[in-house]
Amino acid sequence: MKESYYISNSCVIKNQKVFKNETLVFESNEADFNAFAKATYKNLQLEYPKFFKMDGLSKLAFLASEFLLSDKNEADNIALLFANKSASLDTDLKHQESIQDKDNFFPSPAIFVYTLANICIGEVSIRHRLKSESAFFCSENYQTEFMLNYANYLLQNQKADKVLCGWAEFLNDDY
């Protein structure tokens, strides 16, 4: 007999607003993403100083995950399946700027570490102590059927008890 799975929660962060299960839960007038992210972080009353060192993509994925995993049980085996269109291009461009000029060559390790899109999964995993399956995919659009099939595989084969799927797109402060 085939098991039925369902979406238990959703989170959308867009245009300085956060929606959980289609209900507006936070709004800010901060147009700049970093200022908006900081306001959202403070609203959640978190104590996780590493947040302020993250790139935009990681902050976006981290904040959405906070809204979705706030009631997580420590024993939950939650897989993470994230996707976007631009991978880590926003951070890649910042890194390129730091190494472009031979006379002013100052690559930043703090930026370089975020030049892989899957680092945002690592940030969420560390925060929530997840030692689970994870994958980050890049495609033009969210591939619903692919993600559904992947999530079903993980659940049906006891690779995970739950799966957090997400589209986390961040480029030039657009999210």
Task: Outline where the language-model segments fall.
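Conserved "HGTGT" condensation-loop signature of ketosynthase/thiolase-family condensing enzymes
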Residues: 1-149, 153-160, 164-175
